[in-house]
């Protein structure tokens, strides 16, 4: 086993390179990207590939391509994608994650799913601004989750 330590600047450069690569691949084939990410999410939901790391990686990938799906058009190819494609993908993805919070066991697992929902939603501000009803649903679900108690994470507002 070899342990590699990256400096923060190296980590940031790697993050940006991966993000640009995902954006480029998404622009090449939006539909294929959507299918791959949806299939990966389905394997998270059915438990066959469930892990915090897998879910975090997938949700980071979805957040990193924010706005890319709705800006894709090939003049000589058959692909034409508008904002509806990104909207459909994002709504379905978040709905699946919200469903996962209902069916998954364990508060820590639920916390991981909820934090990933917050991350993805935070990466698509233009979408949320245009779809208030969807934003309201997500925010209500997150507040519902926040009212649950988590051992070791409670903060008292009253001094002892």
Predicted features along the sequence, with ranges:
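Alpha-helix N-cap/helix-start motif at coil-to-helix transitions, marked by capping-box chemistry
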Residues: 56, 88-91, 111, 115, ...
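Alpha-solenoid helical repeat scaffolds
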Residues: 13, 17, 57, 116, ...
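Alpha-helical repeat/alpha-solenoid scaffolds of the HEAT/ARM/MIF4G superfamily
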Residues: 1-88
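Alpha-helix boundary/capping segments in eukaryotic regulatory proteins
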Residues: 30, 69, 73, 105-115, ...
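C-terminal low-complexity, acidic/polar tails when present
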Residues: 49, 70-104, 109, 119-125
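Hydrophobic residues within the alpha-helices of tandem HEAT/HEAT-like
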Residues: 22-26, 58-69, 114-128, 142-147, ...
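Helix-loop junctions that connect tandem helical modules in alpha-solenoid scaffolds
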Residues: 2-10, 40-53, 96-111, 124-127, ...
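Hydrophobic core segments within long, regular secondary-structure runs in both alpha-
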Residues: 34-42, 59-62, 87-101, 118-121, ...
């Amino acid at each position: 086993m070899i342990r590699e330590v990256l400096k923060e600047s190296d980590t940031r450069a790697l993050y940006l390179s991966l993000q640009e690569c995902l954006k480029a691949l998404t622009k090449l084939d939006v539909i294929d990207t959507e299918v791959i990410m949806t299939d990966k999410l389905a394997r998270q939901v059915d438990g066959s590939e469930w892990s915090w790391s897998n879910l975090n990686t997938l949700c980071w990938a979805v957040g990193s391509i924010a706005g890319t799906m709705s800006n894709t058009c090939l003049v000589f190819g058959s692909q034409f994608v508008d904002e509806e494609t990104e909207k459909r993908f994002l709504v379905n993805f978040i709905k699946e994650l919200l469903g996962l919070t209902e069916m998954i066991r364990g508060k820590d697992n639920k916390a991981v799913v909820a934090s990933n929902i917050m991350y993805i939603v935070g990466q698509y501000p233009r979408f949320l601004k245009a779809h208030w009803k969807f934003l309201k649903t997500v925010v209500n679900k997150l507040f519902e989750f926040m009212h649950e108690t988590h051992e070791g994470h409670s903060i008292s507002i009253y001094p002892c």
